[in-house]
């Protein structure tokens, strides 16, 4: 009832706050322009509504102070970071061992660091692989800033760490002592509990079954999953492992059903669901997609649905996970949720509803997919529909039961089923080929795409406008894929440069692809899962430029 009496739509308010966030933390002309445009639109529609002005002034003022505080604190932490520390406390469930390389998130004196350490022996590796305690590492620890973006569409590791409140990398040059932390907080307890569950799965279940169990139940995929991850990414269904609505709906739905069957009145459901949701969020890594789904589910208990639900969810996410809009997962998760809130296909038949939902989601999310990845797999719509049923109706319940019973008996007999499924997916990939390479739009092109889609939503019932707008959207995609310019680019590939040349006609020449020369051999325990320099530097650049084929390749280095 109070939502109906609210002087302003909460989703409109959330959009205004989101544009304010980007204005402060991204600070470019597009962010400032979006904020100014939304503010003018609001004032135009609510100028005479004093209640709306007061509400926006109050909420906007609070978030303005909040964002400025976060920005100032980040600046202080970056400037005041020391050059060296002598001990760091590791967050238990962030420990990752890849061959001889140990990585984790650590904390020391109010600062958070990305910690790296080169393991000295197989015994040391086994210890860090199997421990579930909060460890304090003491020794000589050098701090350094992370590497920023080196190429167009290259991964900006510095910005990625900054979105998690991390401004320095900590390299342990000499490890003197490893001791368990004595006094642990409630938050550290959940980190240890999650780590204990992950270690239990990794040591008791075979591969690849254990990867599906850690991924679907706890939102964790280790380096050993890289090969399968490339397969799922190529097919466009890697998002099935990103915990969100499917998993939250399963666990929260069954927990709610159990409470009702036990006779708990509906009026008391929220009191029990709230702490359960908090624990579930912590056990799954406290990610943006999980928090978004949990908040929306809890708000639905009060009858808050559609855009009001989405608006309040966005405002709460800014409090629980301030920089969620700087992460790919946060943006894509909220974009999918917004599209589902915006359209209503309930009156359609199940088949027609499924087709329309897939088409709307694919078209609405396409600008974001091209902006972040530069690729799109059309068959992913069909595969998502197929495998979401398999994951939701079979894998999730079965893996949950097997994990719960694993303290008594280990069910590894169905591991061949996972091997067969991956073989089947490999066959599908060989049949359908690689994703379409569409290129990455500039911010200007991206804004034009969003504007066209907004107008398409408004004028959908007018056929002439609809066809015209769809043609404009298609032309924008062609513009991104085939820029009308000649190009000569030097790409930093880690060891030297690669030179890329392209003419307006689309003819391409690539000189060198980068590489890494390794000297000597390593013991088996030291071998790590690695990706080539080209996969991290050159290939993302070519995909961002819409290049799907190289006409001429010239190699000048001797290590071919």
Model-derived regions, located:
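Membrane-embedded alpha-helical segments of integral membrane proteins
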Residues: 4-44, 397, 401, 406-458
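Alpha-helix C-terminal capping segments
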Residues: 21-24, 81, 106-108, 198-205, ...
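Hydrophobic alpha-helical transmembrane segments in multi-pass membrane proteins
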Residues: 29-30, 40-59, 228-381, 445-483
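Juxtamembrane/interfacial segments around transmembrane helices
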Residues: 56-64, 81-85, 103-106, 185, ...
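Alpha-helical transmembrane segments of multi-pass integral membrane proteins
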Residues: 341-439
């Amino acid at each position: 009832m109070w939502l109906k009496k609210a002087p302003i739509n909460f989703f409109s308010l959330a959009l205004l706050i989101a544009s304010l966030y980007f204005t402060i933390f991204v600070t470019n002309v597009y962010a400032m322009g979006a904020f100014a445009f939304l503010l003018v639109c609001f004032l135009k529609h609510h100028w005479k509504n004093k209640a709306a002005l007061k509400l926006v002034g109050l909420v906007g003022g609070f978030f303005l102070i909040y964002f400025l505080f976060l920005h100032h604190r980040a600046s202080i932490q970056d400037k005041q970071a020391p050059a060296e520390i002598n001990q760091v406390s590791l967050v238990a469930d962030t420990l990752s061992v890849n061959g001889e390389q140990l990585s984790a998130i650590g904390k020391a004196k109010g600062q958070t660091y990305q910690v790296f350490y080169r393991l000295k022996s197989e015994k040391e590796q086994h210890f860090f692989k199997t421990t579930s305690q909060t460890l304090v590492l003491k020794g000589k620890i050098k701090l350094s800033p992370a590497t920023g973006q080196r190429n167009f569409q290259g991964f900006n590791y510095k910005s990625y760490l900054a979105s998690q409140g991390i401004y320095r990398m900590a390299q342990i040059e000499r490890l003197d002592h490893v001791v368990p932390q004595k006094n642990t907080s409630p938050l550290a307890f959940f980190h240890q509990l999650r780590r204990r569950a992950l270690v239990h799965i990794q040591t008791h279940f075979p591969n690849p079954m254990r990867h599906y169990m850690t991924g679907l139940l706890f939102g964790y995929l280790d380096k050993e999953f890289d090969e399968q991850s490339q397969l799922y990414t190529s097919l466009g269904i890697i998002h099935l492992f990103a915990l969100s609505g499917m998993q939250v709906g399963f666990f929260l739905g069954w927990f709610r059903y159990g409470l009702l069957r036990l006779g708990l009145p509906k009026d008391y459901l929220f009191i029990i669901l709230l702490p359960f949701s908090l624990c579930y969020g912590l056990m799954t890594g406290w990610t943006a997609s999980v928090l978004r789904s949990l908040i929306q589910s809890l708000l639905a208990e009060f009858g808050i649905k559609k855009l009001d639900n989405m608006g309040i969810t966005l405002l709460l996410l800014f409090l629980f996970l301030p920089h969620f809009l700087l992460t790919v997962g946060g943006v894509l998760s909220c974009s999918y949720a917004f599209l589902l809130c915006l359209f209503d296909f309930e009156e359609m038949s199940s088949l027609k509803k499924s087709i329309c939902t897939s088409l709307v989601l694919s078209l609405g999310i396409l600008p974001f997919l091209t902006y972040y990845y530069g690729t799109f797999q059309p068959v992913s719509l069909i595969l998502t529909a197929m495998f979401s049923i398999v994951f939701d109706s079979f894998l999730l319940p079965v893996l949950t039961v097997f994990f719960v019973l694993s303290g008594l008996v280990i069910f590894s007999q169905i591991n061949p089923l996972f091997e067969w499924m991956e073989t089947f997916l490999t066959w599908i990939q060989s049949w359908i080929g690689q994703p379409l390479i569409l290129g990455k739009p500039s911010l200007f092109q991206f804004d034009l795409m969003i504007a066209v889609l907004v107008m398409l939503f408004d004028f959908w019932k007018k056929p002439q406008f609809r066809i015209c707008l769809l043609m404009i959207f298609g032309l924008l995609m062609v513009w991104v894929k085939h820029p009308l310019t000649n190009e000569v680019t030097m790409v930093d590939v880690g060891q030297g440069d690669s030179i890329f040349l392209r003419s307006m006609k689309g003819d391409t020449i690539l000189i060198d692809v980068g590489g890494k020369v390794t000297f000597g051999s390593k013991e088996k325990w030291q071998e790590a899962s690695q990706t080539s320099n080209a996969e991290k530097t050159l290939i993302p650049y070519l995909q961002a430029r819409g290049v799907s084929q190289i006409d001429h390749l010239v190699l000048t280095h001797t290590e071919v």
